[in-house]
Amino acid sequence: MRRLLIPLALWLGAVGVGVAELTEAQRRGLQVALEEFHKHPPVQWAFQETSVESAVDTPFPAGIFVRLEFKLQQTSCRKRDWKKPECKVRPNGRKRKCLACIKLGSEDKVLGRLVHCPIETQVLREPEEHQETQCIRVQRAGEDPHSFYFPGQFAFSKALPRS
C-alpha cells in the first residue's frame, strides 16, 4: 500500500490543482492576487491564470491565510480589460510564475497580501527566503501577538534561599 501512495503523491504534485478544485477561500485569494497583480504600473498587458501549482488555506483566529503558487500567461488584451472573457492567451506571450500570500478576514476583508510574479526566466534569480519571510508577515496580519504561547516565551527562576 505504501508503495502505491508515494507515486500517487508525486503524480498529484506534478499535475497541480485545477481551478475547479479550489476552496472558496482559495478562489477568493486567487481573485485578490490577480487584482493586485494587474494594479502594478509596469504591467501593460492582461495576464490570465493558466495553472495553479499549489493552494493551501489555513484558518487562524483573525481569518484565513491562503498561500497560492500559480502561473500566468500574457493575453491579447490590455491590463484594464483583464476580466473580459474574450481575452485569449497569446501562444508566445510572456509567462510568469507567481507566489501569492493572502490573509482574508471576516466578510472577505483583506487583512494582508503579498503577490510576487517574476517573469519565468527570472524565477531562479529571486531569493526564496525573502518571499517566505514576507509571506509569514502576511500570515500573521490581524493576529494578536499575545494569543499564542511558545515554549520559552516566559521564563521564571526561583531564587535560592539565603544561607
Swiss-Prot record:
GO cellular component: extracellular matrix; extracellular region; extracellular space
Residues of the signal peptide: 1-20
Domain of life from the UniProt record: Eukaryota
This protein's record includes keyword Secreted: yes
Positions annotated as propeptide: 158-163
Role according to the record: Adipocyte-secreted protein (adipokine) that regulates adipogenesis, metabolism and inflammation through activation of the chemokine-like receptor 1 (CMKLR1). Also acts as a ligand for CMKLR2. Can also bind to C-C chemokine receptor-like 2 (CCRL2), but with a lower affinity than it does to CMKLR1 or CMKLR2. Positively regulates adipocyte differentiation, modulates the expression of adipocyte genes involved in lipid and glucose metabolism and might play a role in angiogenesis, a process essential for the expansion of white adipose tissue.
Protein name: Retinoic acid receptor responder protein 2
Taxonomic classification: Eukaryota, Metazoa, Chordata, Craniata, Vertebrata
